[in-house]
Each structure stands twice: as C-alpha cells, then as structure tokens.
Amino acid sequence: MRGSTAMLLAAIALFSSQSFATAIGKSRTLRSFEELEERQLASGSGSNNGLDDVKRSALVELLGEKVVAGGPTSILKAMMKLSDEELQNFIDKNIGSDSDSASGGN
C-alpha cells in the first residue's frame, strides 16, 4: 500500500513539475505585455483566457508601470502578493465589465 501511494505521489509531482517548467519556459520568452497580446491575437487564443477583458491601464493602476512593463511573469508575481480583498476588488472592477453593462449591472 505504501509503495502504491509513493508511486502515485511521485507521478503527480513529476507531472506538476513538468507542467510548471513548461509554463515558466514559455513566459520567459515573452518580453512585454504587448508581445503577449500580439501572440494571443495571432494564435486566436486571446479570447480564451480573460486577459483581453483587462485593460493595460487597469493593470498599471493596480501594479504600476514598471511591473506591467516587466511582462507576464512580473505581473503574476506582483498579483500573487496582493491580498484576497485587493484581488477581488480588481476583479469586480475590471473583469467582465462588458457583460455587466450589457445586462444592466453597471
């Protein structure tokens, strides 16, 4: 039983570390927020992840120009340092505002 559990945990750890390494590798190749947007538009995947719903100016207001200019990795690191309340306020204020206004929420 212990052997099976250890094998399962090892498999999960290996899968997680490979996925994490792949994500880090991809984010290191991005140099700016604009480059991320260009890649998303070129691949047609921009509408799949919610980043299109957030204006760059909103990120600059929340995190600062220097962080946003640092690209996706620095944006994610900075957002991970925010409190749950700050993140929720940002989400409520900026994400999905188009659907809110269409339904009369704004």
Swiss-Prot record:
The keyword Lipoprotein does not apply. Residues 1-17 form the signal peptide. It is found in: Secreted; Host cell. Keywords: Secreted, Signal, Virulence. GO terms for cellular component: extracellular region; host cell. Induction: Expression is up-regulated at the earlier infection stages. It comes from the Eukaryota. A motif (RxLR-dEER) lies at residues 28-39. Its main location: secreted. Belongs to the RxLR effector family. The RxLR-dEER motif acts to carry the protein into the host cell cytoplasm through binding to cell surface phosphatidylinositol-3-phosphate. Effector that may act as a suppressor of cell death to interrupt plant immunity. I. This is Secreted RxLR effector protein 18.
